[in-house]
Curated annotation (Swiss-Prot):
Lineage of origin: Bacteria, Pseudomonadati, Pseudomonadota, Gammaproteobacteria, Aeromonadales
Gene (name only): rnb
A cellular-component GO term for this protein: cytosol
Known catalytic reactions: Exonucleolytic cleavage in the 3'- to 5'-direction to yield nucleoside 5'-phosphates
Naturally occurring in which organism (per UniProt): Aeromonas hydrophila subsp. hydrophila (strain ATCC 7966 / DSM 30187 / BCRC 13018 / CCUG 14551 / JCM 1027 / KCTC 2358 / NCIMB 9240 / NCTC 8049)
UniProt similarity note: Belongs to the RNR ribonuclease family. RNase II subfamily.
Residue span of region Disordered: 650-673
EC number(s) stated in the UniProt entry for this protein: 3.1.13.1
Protein name: Exoribonuclease 2
InterPro entries from the UniProt entry: CSD (IPR011129), CSD2 (IPR040476), NA-bd_OB-fold (IPR012340), RNase_B_OB_dom (IPR013223), RNase_II (IPR011804), RNase_II/R (IPR001900), RNase_II/R_CS (IPR022966), RNase_II/RNase_R (IPR004476)
Ranges in a coiled coil: none
Amino acid sequence: MFQDNPLLAQLKQQIRENIPKKEGVIRASDRGFGFLEVDEKTSYFVPPPYMKKVMHGDRVSALIRTEKEKEVAEPDALLEQSVTRFVARVKMFRDRLNVVADHPLIKDAIKARVKKGLDEKEFKEGDWVVATLKRHALVDGNFSAEITQTIASQEDHNVPWWVVLARHNLAQVEPADLPEWKVIEEEELPRTDLTATPFFTIDGAKTKDMDDALAIRKLDNGWELLVAIADPTAYVAEGSELDKEAAQRAFTVYMPGRNVPMIPRTLSDELCSLKEGEERNTLCARLLIAEDGLLLEETEFFAARISSHARLTYDDVSDWAEHGKQLDIDAGVLAQLPLMKAMTEARIAWRTEHALVFPDRPDYDFELGENGEVLAIHVEPRRIANRMVEESMIAANICAGRVLGKQVGYGIFNVHTGFDEESLDGAIDLLKSAEAPFEKEEIASLSGFCALRRWIDNLDTRWLDGKIRRFQSYALMSAEPGAHYGLGLDAYATWTSPIRKYGDMVNHRLLKAVIAGKTPGERPSLELTEHLTACRRLHRMVERDIGDWLYVRYLKADAGTDKVFNAEIIDVMRAGLKLRLRENGAVVFMPARHILDNKDRLECNWDNGRVYLDKTEVVYELGQIIEVKLTEAVEETRSLIAKPAVELVPGPAPVAPTSEADATPADEAPKAE
């Protein structure tokens, strides 16, 4: 009777049109329901049945209905699909191929088929794959996917590395080698013979791609520092297929226990690596540094042939400097180490007063077994040898920034603008509330930003440091010279890591043109600088994601025990705290309910960066060091969950006043004026 009734269809359409609609982003939960997030302050509940039609992150238009006296959102139209290409695990259901996305908030199995060229019979339960979403339930009535790539079987020991690289669409291996390598520029760029100069390298004990060597001598009023940098552009022609591949990769990918080079290993680890006792082509800079640490303007760039006279390690040099350890090395190199130490201390002192010095944070080194298992995590503090190399490289990059800025006018510059324009008002409001002696125009300038950072670094608490960083901009790559507020410098152009950074290869070619007196190559495109910026962030995510996986495996045995860790609060969110364990660098999450299972009394306030008890008492804040215990280590989501080592036991909740008379004691009653 009602089938194909046009009047009924028209009535339904009219009813639908009269239902209010909202656009927003779907935020899933781990309990089946979700929310439609319209803006920062507005969200609507999405019941589990409606969540079956969408995925976390989808942008949708939804009908806002009232069900059981509560407003709920029913997704109605897909505006932007959040998932297209994704990493998943194979799930067999009644002998049919399904995939489950490797995402903590996307848990439902999706029907799947394989792309042409793959054999469905080869896939088994738990295999890791890359898939593409082909059908969306809100559009097509159901979800379906196509498996496009095999990553690894569940038994593969390399799963953390291969899965993370595949997720970010990065190569697992280095570029293909060439049958023969030839220097392409010998006649055009004469090289000074410095093979007799006692250059030396300082690197990690396991480092193979050594790209910088140093030599120093004392002058009457300071030091002369020679910085020799490996020269892969002597072998890689601009515009060649290998050059294009290096540009696409942008950086060597560094991960716990391994790396994927930007250029073939024959170059990075052999022909260009500045190995002890082997002659190498290099690009060099001669720097002059005054006794007080001032880096003088006079800088000479030139091509040279060098031979490293000693391969030193950070630990050996630091042990020599800090504990008097004897070093059995070339006498010419040994005589330079006191000079390096003195120059480094002078440069640190100068930059601390006139620029900015990054706070010393330790590195964390994963010691892995043959099958990729984590045997130990070693804390490696930044010691004097690390600072020797760091200060030398920073000085060399400052000089490159000067030369490229003045003589070329472009290059690949690292720029950092301090605060984004739209963040300045928020930053100054925060500083005023903290009684900081700064004005808006002041902190927008390079000198004012440096003064602010130095003032904050001298505070007893790290709370303001954690808060103000939320307003700071990200560092970018730019073809134009520009200030780097984070370092407190007018210009900064890196050229000291061309084996592992494509931007440094670009700067090498421009510096070589200056040396040869030739017209420099073309200005780097906006497309290239944006690509380099994006890849730098991506590679940090890769290192973090693999680290998170390995941390969960390593710390699983400590979860649920009474082992206590020191942890720094690095973020305060509405749901809880994010902390970094100081013993090993792992990032853990402490849910608010683990602090106090009473959401009426406990508030985790992101805006203030603090956790409050009963609205007033500060329990925790950004930058605070607290003791925690691990409760869970969940490999499926690569998450570590913690709780306070000492349980918070608050006093009785304050009693709310029952009347205005109760709220104002007699002795505090307002006086008549």
